[in-house]
């Protein structure tokens, strides 16, 4: 009787682990690869042209034109780093370095690089810079939610500023923004 209970318990534990891993991979947090849905490229993270999270080191690229989030090129961070995203919305956490370039037709394009934590975003919706390092972003959006301008994130633990769009900087560090205001709504 005890053996049957132990066997049933072991099966339940294995099923729980399997479902948790699948869910994490689908959400893009998992350590595995995976083309769409989860993290792109190797090692899980990867940047995307659209929105998404990248954890771990990796490389991924996504294109697309006319979307709300511009396509382009994104690269994950070094060790556990998030990485900046070119056109889309998203955030990067952890330490490492990530950079991305994206130009979206109909979306918000621009250039965003994140060092250490998140990094700034070019033309997308906001951007977080968390962790240690340096993040900067340059973006110009045609018809996007946020306009162009230049914003540089903070040093250690610093947030990030955005030139044209809406953004906030928290923690210690330095954030500055210069450039145009909001884009065309």
Curated annotation (Swiss-Prot):
Alphabetical list of InterPro entries matching this protein: GRP1/2
Region named Disordered: 149-185
Keyword terms: Cell wall, Cell wall biogenesis/degradation, Repeat, Secreted, Signal
Protein localization: Secreted, Cell wall
GO CC entries: extracellular region
UniProt keyword Membrane, yes or no: no
UniProt keyword annotation of Repeat present: yes
PANTHER family, alphabetized: GLYCINE-RICH CELL WALL STRUCTURAL PROTEIN 2 (PTHR33548)
Protein role: Responsible for plasticity of the cell wall.
Designated name of the protein: Glycine-rich cell wall structural protein 2
